[in-house]
């Protein structure tokens, strides 16, 4: 079916797609458009060889989806005078008067993000905590840090807060790195550091490397966005909180579609989206167990459980008798050696079932099980369901 150009909604996307969260928003928008379109989408940031799209009033488009993190984008939305959905806007005090009241607003639940980070570290036995915010102390960064610190303090611990950068430090990472490195060195170790975003988490890792702090054993680092281009390229790989930004993009497109169709009747919506989960990588795989034998055994298990190692391999690595190591495990209240091997493997199995399309045979091999039949039996005993049903329920 053909469409005249004038009949196809012209939608501007006001966000920079060099960030994972923004790319996920775009994917959510595209998913909606594939089902309910067509739309003609215009990425306002521009690409090499094309201009930016900011004179939206003269452009004559139909609607806008914008991540409003600066006044330039905010004023562009105001000038356009078309339906818009705003995502994660900065403080209202920094925006043109009336902007937020005029459009639907979707935002990540910053409090839930900070609390998830705190719970993650508390469950791992940390007693020393710190937060490193975004360099400009933007509102979402402050909210994440405040929620993180509040949850840590409710648990009875203090939380160090890093910030107050100079103008020079905001412009030049090398200028800031020494101060951040020195600050990290002064924290009681082992310390759990929550960074406001993946790019900031990468800088924390760089600062640790500069002064010889071991990650994750001296400093465990968790960030936000789960940008694989960043997280998988750091040393060690960076653990990160995955946000529900794809869903947010889909919902933004749905609300904009409704507003474009029923401009004077569409209901203004305000909604927050909680984070999905923590994606654990090496930067937080610290072993916070006082017993050094148990700590060495756990680290060996976590690093090698994807291979078909058994209890004798763990005992051989620690270089003590099996009886002594099992006794230490019981005293540390972490179950038996075999319990930990199986728990670690099943955790990996569940992640691969939910996040990949690999066959059960391939997953069994990748998680250290000798056969898919044995894995199936163990999985049913542990979770009361089959792997097929578990995967189907997670879509």
Place the predicted regions along the sequence by residue.
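Binding-interface segments
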Residues: 375
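A secondary-structure capping/hinge motif
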Residues: 329-337, 378-390
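Bacterial carbohydrate/catabolite-sensing allosteric modules
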Residues: 1-65, 71-317, 322, 326-327, ...
């Amino acid at each position: 079916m053909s469409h005249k150009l004038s009949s196809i909604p012209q939608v501007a996307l006001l966000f920079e797609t060099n960030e994972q969260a923004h790319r996920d928003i775009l994917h959510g928008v595209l998913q909606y458009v594939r089902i309910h379109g067509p739309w003609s989408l215009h990425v306002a940031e521009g690409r090499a060889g094309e201009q930016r799209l900011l004179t939206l009033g003269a452009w004559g488009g139909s609607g806008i989806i914008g991540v409003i993190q600066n006044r330039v984008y905010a004023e562009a939305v105001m000038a356009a005078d078309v339906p818009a959905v705003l995502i994660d806007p900065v403080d209202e005090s920094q925006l043109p008067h009336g902007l937020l009241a005029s459009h639907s607003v979707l935002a990540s639940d910053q409090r839930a993000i900070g609390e998830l980070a705190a719970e993650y570290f508390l469950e791992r036995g940390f007693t020393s905590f710190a937060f490193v915010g975004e360099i400009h102390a933007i509102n979402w960064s402050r909210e994440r840090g405040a929620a993180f610190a509040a949850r840590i303090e409710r648990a009875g611990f203090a939380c160090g807060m890093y910030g107050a950068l100079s103008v020079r430090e905001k412009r030049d990472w090398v200028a800031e790195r020494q101060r951040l490195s020195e600050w990290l060195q002064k924290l009681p170790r082992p310390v759990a550091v929550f960074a406001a975003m993946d790019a900031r988490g990468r800088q924390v890792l760089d600062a640790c490397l500069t002064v010889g702090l071991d990650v994750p054993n001296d400093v465990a680092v968790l960030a936000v966005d789960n940008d694989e281009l960043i997280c998988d390229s750091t040393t060690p790989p960076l653990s990160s909180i995955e946000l529900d930004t794809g869903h947010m993009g889909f919902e933004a497109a749905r609300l904009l579609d409704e507003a474009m169709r029923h401009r004077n009747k569409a209901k203004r919506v305000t909604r927050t989206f909680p984070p999905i989960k923590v994606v654990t990588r090496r930067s937080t795989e610290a072993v916070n167990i006082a017993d050094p034998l148990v700590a060495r055994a756990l680290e060996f298990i976590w690093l090698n459980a994807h291979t078909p190692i058994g209890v004798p391999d763990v005992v051989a690595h620690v270089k003590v008798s099996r009886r002594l190591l099992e006794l230490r495990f019981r005293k540390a209240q972490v179950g038996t050696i075999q319990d930990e091997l199986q728990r670690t493997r099943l955790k990996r199995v569940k992640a691969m079932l939910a996040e990949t399309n690999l066959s059960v045979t391939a997953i069994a091999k990748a998680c250290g099980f000798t056969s898919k039949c044995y894995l199936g039996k163990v999985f049913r005993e542990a979770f009361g369901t089959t792997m097929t049903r578990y995967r189907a329920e997670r879509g």
